């Protein structure tokens, strides 16, 4: 579940940052990275559009992209992405995975995914079956054998 407050797109992305301290360049960049720009242009108030309680007016994929924009905006050293693209179409997922690849070498990413395309860029993969690690290594050694 993605935590969305009953507030604007901007405040949901920069969650926890006082309005006067929001870095608008970082906000715009995180919107671009999460592929939200087209959606936001269609919204009546742009980044100032109210999302409603729990983002009720958004699809699952749109809520995921708000969460990704938040992760990109806050620029943490470690990002945990648990099925972060599961509700996205394959084209949008591919675009976002390309953005995530750009973080390689600068961030520690822990990616939990069922779609193999999501983890293809990872340095190290753990394959878990019934709660146990059954394989580990790079993409080719873990997935290539299946």
Where is each model-derived feature located?
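ABC ATPase nucleotide-binding domain helical subdomain, centered on the C-loop/LSGGQ "ABC signature"
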Residues: 10-53, 97-98, 106, 135, ...
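A short, proline-enriched helix->beta-strand linker immediately N-terminal to the Walker B motif
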Residues: 73-77, 106
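Hydrophobic anchor residue at the start of the ABC signature
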Residues: 68, 112
């Amino acid at each position: 579940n993605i935590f969305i407050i009953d507030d604007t797109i901007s405040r949901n992305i920069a969650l926890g940052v006082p309005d006067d301290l929001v870095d608008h360049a970082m906000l715009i960049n995180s919107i671009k990275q999460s592929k939200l720009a087209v959606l936001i242009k269609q919204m009546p108030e742009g980044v100032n559009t109210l999302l409603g309680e729990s983002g009720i007016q958004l699809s699952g994929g749109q809520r995921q992209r708000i969460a990704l924009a938040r992760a990109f905006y806050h620029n943490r050293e470690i990002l945990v992405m648990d099925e972060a693209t599961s509700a996205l179409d394959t084209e949008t997922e591919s675009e976002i995975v390309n953005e995530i690849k750009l973080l390689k070498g600068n961030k520690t990413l822990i990616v939990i995914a069922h779609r193999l395309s999501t983890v293809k860029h990872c340095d190290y993969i753990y394959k878990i079956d019934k709660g146990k690690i059954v394989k580990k290594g790079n993409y080719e050694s873990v997935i290539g054998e299946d």
